[in-house]
């Protein structure tokens, strides 16, 4: 009788878990649609600021501090985007692993990595391993907004402009040295079944190259859709140098916001996949327990 009672309790608990997992799967599925829509809606703005920045940069010979590589960089800021909640499979593990690999590479080149983390799970991971964080933010991984990124990016830009030879106030109020480069570690959303941990150097800004092949007889500056077209000429007001000063920080904010949106979509997709698998396993165990109880 005791064994039968324990089996009934196990059946009840397994059925309850299966319902919870299935509910989480449905919630994640509904959120993916919204996350994908936000990512798609932001894409034209991100592309347009790249186009404008390219036009402005091409109209000036000024060497901007956000574009120039520094010799012998001593410190590099690493901003990692993780989730606030769990139950999303290997989502956080994969992005944290990519961060660890980046940190090892930086150390091999004599550069000290300085970690900044978005997301409660990433913060908990580094706190558990007694790893000091120069900055931490949480509470918006599923629904990031520009306002959420204002404080982190202002601090990171100040840190880069200060450089490793100077000091500035950290988000927690302590004094820390500046940095000579800024890296971003996040998750790229490819599909419902594929989310790729990604590392990007944000500052100094890396040039973006077009991978499309050039056809024979086509010039690098020509428009492949119209061989007679010419690049437009622009007149800037105020001048191109002043515009570049304003546009580069906005470009960086746009890139990080796009990464946060992709990470949110990736988190939803990873959670849906994990909960779907957990639901299937729960029902498999439930059927096994019920079969045993009927013997």
Where are these regions (language model features)?
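Conserved AMP-binding A3 loop
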Residues: 295
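C-terminal beta-strand-loop-alpha-helix "lid" module of Rossmann-like NAD(P)-dependent dehydrogenases
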Residues: 1-287, 292
């Amino acid at each position: 009788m005791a064994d039968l009672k324990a089996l009934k309790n196990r059946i009840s608990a397994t059925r309850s878990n299966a319902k919870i997992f299935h509910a989480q799967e449905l919630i994640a599925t509904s959120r993916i649609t919204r996350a994908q829509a936000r990512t798609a809606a932001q894409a034209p703005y991100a592309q347009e600021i790249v186009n404008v920045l390219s036009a402005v940069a091409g109209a000036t010979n000024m060497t901007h501090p956000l574009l120039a590589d520094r010799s012998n960089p001593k410190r590099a800021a690493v901003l990692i985007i993780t989730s606030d909640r769990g139950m999303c499979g290997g989502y956080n593990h994969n992005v944290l692993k990519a961060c660890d690999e980046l940190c090892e590479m930086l150390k091999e080149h004599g550069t000290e990595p300085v970690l900044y983390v978005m997301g409660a799970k990433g913060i908990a991971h580094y706190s558990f391993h007694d790893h000091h964080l120069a900055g931490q933010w949480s509470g918006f991984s599923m629904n990031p907004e520009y306002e959420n990124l204002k404080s982190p990016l202002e601090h990171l830009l100040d840190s880069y402009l200060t450089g490793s030879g100077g000091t500035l106030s950290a988000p927690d109020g302590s004094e820390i040295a500046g940095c000579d480069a800024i890296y971003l570690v996040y998750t790229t959303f490819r599909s419902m079944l594929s989310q790729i941990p990604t590392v990007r150097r944000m500052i100094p800004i890396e040039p973006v190259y077009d991978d499309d092949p050039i056809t024979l007889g086509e010039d690098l500056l020509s428009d492949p859709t119209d061989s007679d077209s010419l690049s437009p000429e622009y007149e800037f007001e105020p001048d191109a140098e002043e515009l570049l000063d304003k546009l580069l920080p906005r470009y960086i904010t746009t890139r990080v916001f796009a990464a946060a949106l992709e990470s949110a979509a990736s988190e939803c997709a990873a959670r849906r996949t994990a909960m779907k698998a957990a639901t299937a396993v729960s029902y498999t165990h439930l059927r096994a327990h019920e079969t045993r109880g009927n013997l």
